[in-house]
Swiss-Prot record:
NCBIfam families the UniProt entry points to: PRK00142.1-3 (NF001135)
PANTHER family cross-referenced by the UniProt entry: RHODANESE-LIKE DOMAIN-CONTAINING PROTEIN 7-RELATED, THIOSULFATE SULFURTRANSFERASE/RHODANESE-LIKE DOMAIN-CONTAINING PROTEIN 2
Assigned protein family: Belongs to the TrhO family.
The protein's Enzyme Commission number: 1.14.-.-
Record keywords: Oxidoreductase, tRNA processing
SMART domains: RHOD (SM00450)
One Pfam family it belongs to: Rhodanese
GO molecular function: oxidoreductase activity, acting on paired donors, with incorporation or reduction of molecular oxygen
Domain Rhodanese stretches: 123-217
Protein name: tRNA uridine(34) hydroxylase
Length: 316
């Protein structure tokens, strides 16, 4: 394929994130790359797309910088660009865990498990595997038997763990996320919270799916990604669809954002049901005056009224 998507992070010291972000944006644009990079004093977190040649040049330049020389790049072949624009933004932290006291992964983090070791942990009855992603990511795809925290954002995870601490306190804990960066801090936080045996999947789900030993086995569904692809295949052994349509519960792997801009909830649904519900996740959202689906498809007032009448009749 002509294009590649890079997923990477590196905890290191960047003295002036704002100046670095400005320079790095210019560098990325010089290579015609598109994507999103976050920069903080604690390091860098990015996902980029470009031609094979351009992304290879980017990785070479990063590896030549002492701060990023051993960065682990997860590489996905792609048929087209996965992003439309290029952003490099300074932040106070790379991932937000909403902690009273921050965790430095360079000092405290869980043991790294390579894909084959992680697969063994999945099969171990004495190990609890916790998905460190958001609920909508889990619902599209996850490892078999993994715990699904009831959270809409990563910053809600510590509170959820505290509320359910008695279920996991005396267990071996293994965490996983998309590329590994969330687990660096989350696993370190677990150790600080008193959990004694904590490990994490090295390189995240993205690495597990490409590993020649595991080939994504024991993963069900697809992996949610934060770019135009929306999702990617992980299991190359025995693929299974687990996503369910928001409206009728049928198998589904198609994500949309609710058409109500004030809601924006991500839901799995078919084109038929999206059409039927005017892109809304609820009757209230379908009725919203700023409904983006209505605007995008240039629906007339009569067409909108007709569909809403059908939905309202079902609600009654």
């Amino acid at each position: 394929m002509k294009y590649q998507v890079l997923l990477y992070y590196k905890y290191t010291t960047i003295e002036d994130p704002e100046a670095f972000a400005k320079e790095h944006l210019a560098f990325c644009k010089s290579l015609n790359l598109k994507g999103r990079i976050l920069v903080a004093t604690e390091g860098i977190n990015g996902t980029l797309s470009g031609t094979v040649e351009e992304t290879e040049k980017y990785m070479e330049a990063m590896q030549a910088d002492e701060r990023f020389k051993d960065t682990f790049f997860k590489i996905d072949p792609a048929e087209e660009m996965a992003f439309r624009k290029m952003f490099v933004r300074p932040r106070s932290e790379l991932v937000a865990l909403n902690l009273e006291e921050d965790v430095d992964p360079l000092e405290t983090t869980g043991k790294y498990l390579e894909p084959a070791e992680f697969k063994e942990a999945l099969l171990d009855e004495d190990t609890v595997v916790i998905d460190a992603r958001n609920d909508y990511e889990y619902d599209l795809g996850h490892f078999r038997g993994a715990v699904r925290p009831d959270i809409r954002s990563f910053r809600e995870l510590p509170q959820w763990i505290r509320e359910n601490k008695e279920k996991f306190m005396d267990k071996k804990i293994v965490t996983y996320c998309t590329g590994g960066i969330r687990c660096e801090k989350f696993s370190g936080w677990l150790l600080k919270e008193g959990f004694e045996d904590v490990a994490q999947l090295h390189g995240g789900i993205a690495n597990y799916g490409k590993n020649p030993e595991t080939r994504g086995e024991l993963w069900d569904g697809k992996m949610y990604v934060f770019d135009d692809r929306i999702s990617v295949e992980i299991n190359h052994v025995d693929k299974k669809v687990i996503g369910k349509d928001w409206f009728d519960g049928t198998p589904c792997e198609r994500y949309i954002n609710c058409a109500n801009p004030e809601c924006n909830r991500q839901i799995l649904t078919s084109e038929e049901n999206e059409h039927k519900h005017l892109g809304g996740c609820s009757l209230e959202c379908s009725q919203h005056p700023a409904n983006r689906y209505v605007k995008k498809h240039n629906l007339t007032e009569a067409e909108v009224a007709e569909r809403l009448a059908l939905l309202e009749a079902v609600e009654v």
